[in-house]
Amino acid sequence: MTSPRKTHPLTKIINESFIDLPTPPNISSWWNFGSLLGICLIIQITTGLFLAMHYTPDTSTAFSSVAHITRDVNYGWMIRYMHANGASMFFVCLFLHIGRGLYYGSFLSLKTWNIGTILLLTTMATAFMGYVLPWGQMSFWGATVITNLMSAIPYIGSDLVQWIWGGFSVDKATLTRFFTFHFILPFIIAALATIHLLFLHETGSSNPSGMTSDPDKITFHPYYTAKDILGLIFLLLSLMSLTLFMPDLLTDPDNYTLANPLNTPPHIKPEWYFLFAYAILRSIPNKLGGVLALVLSILILMVIPMLHLSKQQSMMFRPITQILFWTLVADLLTLTWIGGQPVEYPFVTIGQTASITYFFIIIILMPLSASIENMLLKW
């Protein structure tokens, strides 16, 4: 008799996705981040749900409700810091997951890659709105600065900003709608992640070599379930170490001051995971130009499959492109550093150079190096 695991309509879906899924035998730990992102999402939804039970989305009580959570609610401090640092872990896993996709040519699975890019944008929107909720100084001014960027859109810009704000400034209406969207978006992310998996399982995973692994597959369970559990242990270790020993390492001290529309903080900056995009935005003196560069710095991911001129999928055997890839990583780290610095010499110049380098490597140098490698291999 066939096992109900393989025949029951519900368990059959789980079986085909996580148990009997044919998987390449040679995928490395870089393939762990997909499952870790799933775990991060579960952690964020769970902790967020408990926070929402005690939080009040109102300008007069939001800040004190967060203080109440950390002081008076049982383990409220832990839930809050797990949620805040969980977002950081989420983005660490996201960036590594995207980096792996770029390095090993996973972007050639177009549907999976494009849904992934939409997932990145949705996650960024969710994190931004979550940062506004504690209603500290950086929450308020971050919301004001970033939503104000919409005013750069010709004709409809200023109307659009007022429509988003629900008034003439960031106020009660803005906070309420941001809370609403921050609550609903993680469930949309979960739905998109399911579609992401659906498209992935249509083609199957790629592998480090970039060659087809169709003739040689192993089942996902027990091999990769055990491997994913190891990744999960490292993730939880990192998250709990951060939460219990250095909970405020990645937060801004200004956010412990109640939002005050009459007092601007000396340096308005977002959380660390947005700093690279913020640096690109600031490096262009023109407002509309900056907004376009900001949007393109993320949407460029969708163009990468078209810029792939190499006859090989993976970068594993392409030393010239490997050098460019790691230069791009260094460039992104530089942008992240610059995003947190004040707008003055020499940071402005470094930011502009790093921003130009970012687009130059992706649009010009990588396709060029692929063509050179093809020529050297006489392909």
UniProtKB/Swiss-Prot annotation:
The name under which this protein is listed is: Cytochrome b
The remark listed among the other comments is:
Heme 1 (or BL or b562) is low-potential and absorbs at about 562 nm, and heme 2 (or BH or b566) is high-potential and absorbs at about 566 nm.
This chain's function reads: Component of the ubiquinol-cytochrome c reductase complex (complex III or cytochrome b-c1 complex) that is part of the mitochondrial respiratory chain. The b-c1 complex mediates electron transfer from ubiquinol to cytochrome c. Contributes to the generation of a proton gradient across the mitochondrial membrane that is then used for ATP synthesis.
- Listed binding positions for a ubiquinone are 201
User: Subunit info?
Assistant: The cytochrome bc1 complex contains 11 subunits: 3 respiratory subunits (MT-CYB, CYC1 and UQCRFS1), 2 core proteins (UQCRC1 and UQCRC2) and 6 low-molecular weight proteins (UQCRH/QCR6, UQCRB/QCR7, UQCRQ/QCR8, UQCR10/QCR9, UQCR11/QCR10 and a cleavage product of UQCRFS1). This cytochrome bc1 complex then forms a dimer.
SUPFAM superfamilies with a match to the protein in the record = a domain/subunit of cytochrome bc1 complex (Ubiquinol-cytochrome c reductase), Transmembrane di-heme cytochromes
Note the PROSITE patterns from the entry: CYTB_CTER, CYTB_NTER
Residues holding heme b b562: 83, 182
Q: Does the keyword tRNA processing apply?
A: no
Which family does the record claim for this protein? Belongs to the cytochrome b family.
According to the record, cofactor stoichiometry and binding are noted as: Binds 2 heme b groups non-covalently.
Record's InterPro entries?
Cyt_b/b6_C, Cyt_b/b6_C_sf, Cyt_b/b6_N, Cytb/b6-like_sf, Cytochrome_b, Cytochrome_b_C_euk/bac, Cytochrome_b_N_euk/bac, Di-haem_cyt_TM
| Transmembrane regions listed in the UniProt entry | 33-53, 77-98, 113-133, 178-198, 226-246, 288-308, 320-340, 347-367
So which cofactors does this thing need?
heme b
Q: Which residues bind heme b b566?
A: 97, 196
Keywords carried by this UniProt record: Electron transport, Heme, Iron, Membrane, Metal-binding, Mitochondrion, Mitochondrion inner membrane, Respiratory chain, Transmembrane, Transmembrane helix, Transport, Ubiquinone
Gene Ontology, cellular component aspect: mitochondrial inner membrane; respiratory chain complex III
Molecular function GO labels: metal ion binding; ubiquinol-cytochrome-c reductase activity
